UniProtKB/Swiss-Prot annotation:
This is NAC domain-containing protein 30. It holds the Pfam family NAM. One of its GO terms (biological process) is response to brassinosteroid. Residues 109-164 bind DNA. Keywords: Activator, Cell wall biogenesis/degradation, Developmental protein, DNA-binding, Nucleus, Plant defense, Transcription, Transcription regulation. The lineage of its organism: Eukaryota, Viridiplantae, Streptophyta, Embryophyta, Tracheophyta. Disruption phenotype: Defects in protoxylem vessel formation in seedling roots. The NAC domain includes a DNA binding domain and a dimerization domain. Residues 9-158 form the NAC domain. Expressed in developing protoxylems in roots and shoots. Detected in root protoxylem poles and in vessels of protoxylems, outermost metaxylems, inner metaxylems, shoots and hypocotyls. Expressed in roots, hypocotyls, cotyledons and leaves. Accumulates in the xylem but not in interfascicular fibers or pith cells in inflorescence stems. Present in developing vessels of the secondary xylem in roots undergoing secondary growth. One of its GO terms (cellular component) is nucleus. Belongs to the plant vascular related NAC-domain protein family.
Length: 324
């Protein structure tokens, strides 16, 4: 019959009835000796068979199964008693929890009892992972339990708790997080080093310019000229937030400061240059070198013009005194 059952099932056939279908259709027809459209639930003597033998006995079709259905007839443990015989050769089935009602259109049509298989003899049996749901016909939850008659059962093995998906490795997942954090730290360190290096380069450049142009009243014009022609490199700063501004704003502010520096003239510097000219009238090369290196704004007279005017005044003053 097993070969006929397996060969009659089409490929891909799966049997997953609901509790209402098990009780209201299959069990009801079994008790009333009515044939079903397809005999997919077999009859077995559950208490003469171990749970691991149910898989081969109740196999349906060619697909792998994780639950098995069968009819079983309950017998009394003692002829004059009311308890059901649930012992097997290697162990026993023990009821656990409360019975649950099976409903159809909000009406009770049956009850479900949950049993767990124990290896050995009571009360020292070892609990296994085999579980069975036993369904019986019953019209009310308060009706007395019938210890004899047909029941339909669904046997399965309890799933392993905290079962990981296939191929899941916790250490790989942890390593991934560690590597990600290390990569992030390395990138932050490299960016920080880059900005620090840029700031150091700019600072060294400023120090070099300051060392070549020590403060000197005679060298003020050349230092102003050099700082006006040299364009300092722009420092890169990490963009922390949009509120800190953009490079465009920085360039505009730099140009404004540069324009202010050219438009502003320190009159003390001009006085110093004039005093230097008067003190050294016979050494015009120094004055000519200093004044030529200075390039003021077009709105003010050039230093070369000032030198010519001063020289003319000196000659005019000397001409007023006759030679002795």
């Amino acid at each position: 019959m097993d070969n006929i059952m397996q060969s009659s099932m089409p490929p891909g056939f799966r049997f997953h009835p609901t509790e209402e279908e098990l009780v209201g259709y299959y069990l009801d027809r079994k008790i009333n000796s009515m044939k079903s459209a397809l005999d997919v639930i077999v009859e077995i003597d559950l208490y003469k068979m171990e749970p691991w033998d149910i898989q081969a006995r109740c196999k349906l079709g060619y697909e792998e199964q994780n639950e098995w259905y069968f009819f079983s007839h309950k017998d009394r443990k003692y002829p004059t008693g009311t308890r059901t015989n649930r012992a097997t050769a290697a162990g026993f089935w023990k009821a656990t929890g409360r019975d649950k009602a099976v409903l159809s259109k909000n009406s009770v049509i049956g009850m479900r009892k949950t049993l767990v298989y124990y290896k050995g003899r009571a009360p020292n049996g070892r609990k296994s992972d085999w579980i069975m749901h036993e369904y019986r016909l019953q019209n009310s939850e308060l009706a007395p339990v019938q210890e004899e008659g047909w029941v339909v059962c669904r046997a399965f093995r309890k799933p392993i708790p905290n079962q990981r998906p296939l191929g899941y490795e916790p250490w790989q997942n942890q390593l991934y997080h560690v590597e990600s954090s290390n990569n992030y730290s390395s990138s932050v360190t490299m960016n920080t080093s880059h900005h620090i290096g840029a700031s150091s380069s700019s600072h060294n450049l400023n120090q070099m310019l300051m060392s070549n142009n020590h403060y000197n009243p005679n060298n003020t014009s050349s230092s102003m000229h050099q700082y006006g022609n040299i364009e300092l490199p722009q420092l890169d700063s990490p963009s922390l937030s949009p509120s800190l501004g953009t490079n465009k704003d920085q360039n505009e502010s730099f140009e404004q400061e540069e324009e202010k520096s050219f438009n502003c003239v320190d009159w003390r510097t001009l006085d110093t240059l004039l005093e230097t000219q008067v003190i050294h009238p016979h050494n015009p090369n120094i004055l000519m070198f200093e004044t030529q290196s200075y390039n003021p704004a077009p709105s003010f007279p050039s230093m070369h013009q000032s030198y010519n005017e001063v020289e003319a005044n000196i000659h005019h003053s000397l001409g007023c005194f006759p030679d002795s």
